[in-house]
Amino acid sequence: MKLTYIILFLFINIFCSKIFSQTIAIVNVQSLIDNNKIYQKTVKDIEINQDKYLKDFNITENELTIKLNEIEESKLILSKEEINKQIEDYNNQLSQFSITIEEFNFHYQNEIIKIREVILNEILKLLEKYALENSVDLILDSTTYLIASNSLDITTDINSELEKLNLNLEYKDFEKN
């Protein structure tokens, strides 16, 4: 019986010391990306770039609305074949316009995702460096835990290192087909 207690005591001491000796840190990756000044500037540049296309899209949309109104007004004047031809032409133009809008949205969503991935890769490099320099065994994202001490949060440390980097965040302009 004493041997069982001794083995149990040794077992608990050996494994509990391993568990409690791990150093854990918390980082808010979402905040690091969203609050990065270079990222914010790049997103603003993208929005400015999008504006020139949005103006063209509004013009095209207005032209399509006018064309639809003209078709409605000419129903009494034109033959059924001519109306069907105009409707078919309108539907083709509307379809092309919708495809262009979808491509536009998809393009800029992908560009922002690529930019965020570049920043994330830099954050991961900084986290690896931080973990090695500070003997941190485990770094968790702030979305993967419920409650933790603020002393575990290294977001500000990583943010200051991230701000020192000169990130090259490029995006491609939208090209209509």
Task: Go through each PLM region and give its residues.
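Amphipathic, charged alpha-helical segments and their helix-to-coil junctions
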Residues: 22-177
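Sec/Tat signal peptide C-region and signal peptidase I cleavage site
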Residues: 15-21
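Short, flexible, glycine/charge-rich loop motifs used to bind or transfer phosphoryl groups or to couple energy/partner
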Residues: 14-15, 129
